[in-house]
């Protein structure tokens, strides 16, 4: 006759303090992202899954919890999804149903997403990658979902460029070049500035599911920096990227503002209470530190601020 093992996790803790998030990270699953009239995209996604833990319970039954989590994720990813945030939402709701001691379930997913495009000058076929970010939080009051992406681009420092332009202006004056010719030259030939590799992160969260097209969101993020970058670049493409970046030099702060403007202009149908998170981090080329800026705001606030320009 087998003896039932004690359920230590269900006992009371020595210190009766509740925990906001208990769960697992690094759970890898295949996710099929459906496309109408086309083959689905298969993503290798990494999940984080959490529930809250009441003060009267010692633990979250990690081994048993993992069975529930695995079953939940398998159910959520078994069918093709057209929106990755819905995968997280379905998983969070199922997780909440299966835990009688929790009031909140959170599921977060990241995956690398590949799109096809052409290089800007030579028009050669290439691919671009972005990191998809999706999450969902389920409570008895409902489920909120978030969708976003993290992309890489190029930025040029306006301050450094301004100093180069000033030096060029003085040199041309010493060569007796007329002022209007100098200004026309500097306008059409942006001067050198130190560059950075930029990382833009943009997410949109709302109750239910945000009406956001993932590809459009990625486009907004890529266009927020001085220039896009490409995996494949022939010499004409390198020239194009360098020129475009120096023609639109941006501080890290300017990139976040461009994200805000892009969201407002691209997604007019999003509700005012949608929460937009915008982050920009630049890997500095001439400093040992990096630059960072961010803004988290409701969409109605961003709409008001952008309309004031």
From Swiss-Prot:
Cofactor: Fe(2+)
InterPro entries cross-referenced by the UniProt entry: GTP_cyclohydrolase_FolE2/MptA (IPR003801), GTP_cyclohydrolase_MptA (IPR022840)
Gene Ontology MF term list: GTP cyclohydrolase I activity; GTP cyclohydrolase IV activity; iron ion binding
Domain of life: Archaea
Enzyme's top EC category: hydrolase
Cofactor notes: Binds 1 Fe(2+) ion per subunit.
GO process terms (BP): tetrahydromethanopterin biosynthetic process
Reaction(s) catalysed by this chain's protein: GTP + H2O = 7,8-dihydroneopterin 2',3'-cyclic phosphate + formate + diphosphate + H(+)
Site (May be catalytically important) residue list: 157
UniProt pathway: Cofactor biosynthesis; 5,6,7,8-tetrahydromethanopterin biosynthesis
EC number: 3.5.4.39
Pfam families associated with the record: GCHY-1
Signal peptide range: none
Keywords, alphabetical: Hydrolase, Iron, Metal-binding
Function description: Converts GTP to 7,8-dihydro-D-neopterin 2',3'-cyclic phosphate, the first intermediate in the biosynthesis of coenzyme methanopterin.
Assembly with partners or alone: Homodimer.
Family matches, as HAMAP family: GTP_cyclohydrol_A
Family (UniProt): Belongs to the GTP cyclohydrolase IV family.
Protein name, as recorded: GTP cyclohydrolase MptA
Source species: Haloarcula marismortui (strain ATCC 43049 / DSM 3752 / JCM 8966 / VKM B-1809) (Halobacterium marismortui)
Gene name of the encoded protein: mptA
């Amino acid at each position: 006759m087998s003896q039932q093992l004690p359920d230590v996790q269900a006992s009371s803790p020595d210190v009766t303090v509740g925990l906001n998030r208990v769960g697992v990270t690094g759970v890898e699953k295949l996710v099929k992202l459906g496309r109408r009239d086309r083959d689905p995209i298969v993503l290798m996604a990494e999940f984080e899954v959490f529930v809250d833990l009441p003060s009267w319970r010692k633990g979250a039954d990690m081994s048993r919890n993992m069975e529930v989590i695995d079953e939940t994720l398998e159910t959520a990813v078994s069918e093709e999804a057209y929106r990755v945030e819905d995968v997280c939402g379905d998983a969070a709701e199922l997780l909440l149903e299966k835990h009688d001691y929790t009031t909140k379930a959170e599921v977060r997913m990241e995956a690398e997403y590949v799109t096809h495009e052409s290089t800007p000058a030579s028009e050669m076929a290439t691919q671009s990658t972005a990191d998809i970010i999706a999450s969902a939080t389920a409570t008895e009051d409902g489920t909120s979902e978030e969708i976003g992406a993290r992309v890489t681009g190029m930025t040029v420092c306006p301050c450094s460029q301004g100093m180069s332009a000033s030096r060029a202006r003085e040199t041309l004056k010493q060569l007796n070049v007329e002022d209007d010719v100098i200004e026309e030259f500097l306008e059409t030939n942006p001067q050198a500035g130190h560059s950075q590799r930029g990382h833009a992160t943009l997410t949109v969260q709302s109750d239910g599911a945000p009406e956001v097209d993932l590809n459009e969101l990625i486009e907004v993020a890529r266009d927020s920096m001085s220039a896009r970058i490409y995996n494949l670049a022939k010499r004409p493409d390198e020239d194009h990227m360098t020129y475009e970046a120096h023609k639109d030099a941006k501080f890290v702060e300017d990139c976040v503002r461009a994200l805000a403007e892009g969201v407002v202009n691209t997604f007019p149908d999003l509700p005012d209470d949608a929460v937009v998170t915008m982050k920009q981090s630049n890997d500095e080329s001439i400093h040992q530190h990096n630059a960072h800026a961010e803004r988290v705001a409701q969409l109605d606030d961003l709409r008001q601020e952008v309309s004031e320009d």
